[in-house]
Structure formats: structure tokens, C-alpha cells
Amino acid sequence: DPTIDLWSLDEVHFCQHGSRCRMWVPWEEDDPVLWHYPGRKSVGYFGAVRLRDGKSLFRKEPEMFNGETFWAFLRQLETASQENGRRVVVIADNSKYHHAKLHAAWRLERQGRFSLDFLPPYSPELNPIERVWKRTRRNCLHNAYFPRLALVAESVEKQFVRWSEPNAELAQLCQL
């Protein structure tokens, strides 16, 4: 429908310890030492991608995800998606804070022009933005050592800057 802008929304944590995947090691090296941060520190982001053209919006969340932080991101998304006057429908999962009473009245007030559509429970594979998170991890975090959490955020945000304008890569990645 050309009168609707469909957005995919989700939140993610990028861990400091990174991940190792395929790599090449010279045959003469018996046991390569691979640096790996031993903790469970992570940096969180809200993200949304407009499926029509790949326009994206990302927001770092330094504390935790909850109803207040989600509401702040929804307001930011509403502002970013108003440029063309289309109705905005946002695909989201069933996290408890997506249904919070805190922003229920706000959502009801905007229901005609800005609404949330929830995925079935326990089905993250149906959310197109999950593929964006996977690509971000592969491009920014695989086979890399991050001695500080700030370096993880820096690496991820460089990718987000590359995706800041509507682009074909995200549009193709998020095709339904």
C-alpha cells in the first residue's frame, strides 16, 4: 500500500567479547592465541528500518531497555517518519515494555497515523531487522578483539553512519 510506511523495530546488545568465525592460520602455527575479552559487558541499541527504501534510525541505550526508553525511541521514530505524510506501521516483537501502560495513551492518541503491529510470540526470525543485527555483527564484531566497551560502540556506530541515508543494502536485507 503506497499510503503506508512499514518499519521494522527491535533492540539489540552487542557484546564486548565478540565472536570468532572462519579464519586462516598458517600451518606452521600449532596453537594460535586468539584474544578474547572475558566479560559479559555489552552496549545496547534500539533500531528501526523502513522496509520501502532502507532508511534507518538507531539509538544507543546506555542504561537498560524499559518502557521509558522505548517510548523515547518511539517519539524519535515518529519525528523521523513524518516527512512524507504517510501512515506509519511499526513491526515489533512482544517485549513487555512494548506494551507498557506508560505509553499506551500516547499510542492510542496516534493510532490513525502511527501504530505498532506485534509479531507472534517467540518468532524473532519474522522481524526483518534481525538480519540487520546479524550483518552488523558480521561486519563489525567477528574476529576482532575489543579491550574496551567503547571500541565496540565505535565500531558498530561507524556501520550505522554508513547506513544513515536510505540505501539499497538495507532495503534488500529487510525485504519481506
Ranges and model annotations:
Residues 10, 85-99, 122, 127:
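Acidic/histidine-rich, metal-coordinating catalytic segments
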Residues 31-38, 108-131, 145:
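RNase H-like polynucleotidyl transferase catalytic core
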Residues 2-6, 129-176:
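C-terminal anion-handling pockets and recognition modules
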